[in-house]
A protein has these predicted regions:
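Hydrophobic, regular-secondary-structure patches
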Residues: 29-31
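N-terminal leader/capping segments at the start of a protein or of a new domain
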Residues: 1-26
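Short, conserved turn/kink motifs that form compact alpha/beta structural patches or helix kinks used as
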Residues: 1-9, 33-150
Length: 150
């Protein structure tokens, strides 16, 4: 039994162990929020959108969920496939909101190479149990990608 003046867990336990998590990160990503796609004016034609703001660029850990989380869906009479991707950002990264868009810029030999250049949408956010990293649950809508489907 420790003395009353001692702590079993260091007060900055997460800060001490965060480098281990960051060392296991297998991708480089860019996170954007806001922006609009533009629109259409019946008189003048296309209207410009507004660019999204980059809120984070750096290392992340990406894992594809084993099963199709969202599965196949129907959108306007077309079958679309949506997969769940879990993404972890470093402890020091700014907190990201649901709805943010993440572009996978690169992966290392331990990352899912099929996600390079894909755009993921953040569905939910949270922190690991000890605050070591920010956990984002993302949607990989395989039918609506800038470069087309898979």
């Amino acid at each position: 039994m420790p003395f009353d003046s001692t702590r079993v867990v260091h007060p900055d336990w997460a800060g001490h162990h965060a480098p281990v998590s960051e060392g296991a990160m297998n991708a480089t990503v860019t996170v954007r929020t806001g922006g609009s796609p533009g629109g259409w004016d019946p008189v003048t034609g296309p209207t410009p959108g507004t660019p999204a703001m980059v809120t984070f660029t750096g290392r992340a850990r990406i894992t594809y969920e084993v099963l199709r989380g969202y599965g196949d869906r129907d959108a306007a009479g077309q079958a679309v496939t949506v997969r769940v991707v879990t993404l972890a950002l470093p402890r020091a990264a700014p907190e990201q909101p649901a709805g943010a868009r993440i572009t996978v810029d690169a992966v290392d030999q331990n990352g899912p190479v099929e996600l390079v250049a894909r755009v993921l949408t953040v569905d939910s956010t949270g922190w690991s149990s000890h605050g070591i990293e920010q956990i984002l649950t993302c949607r990989d809508d395989q039918s609506n990608q800038p470069q087309g489907g898979p």
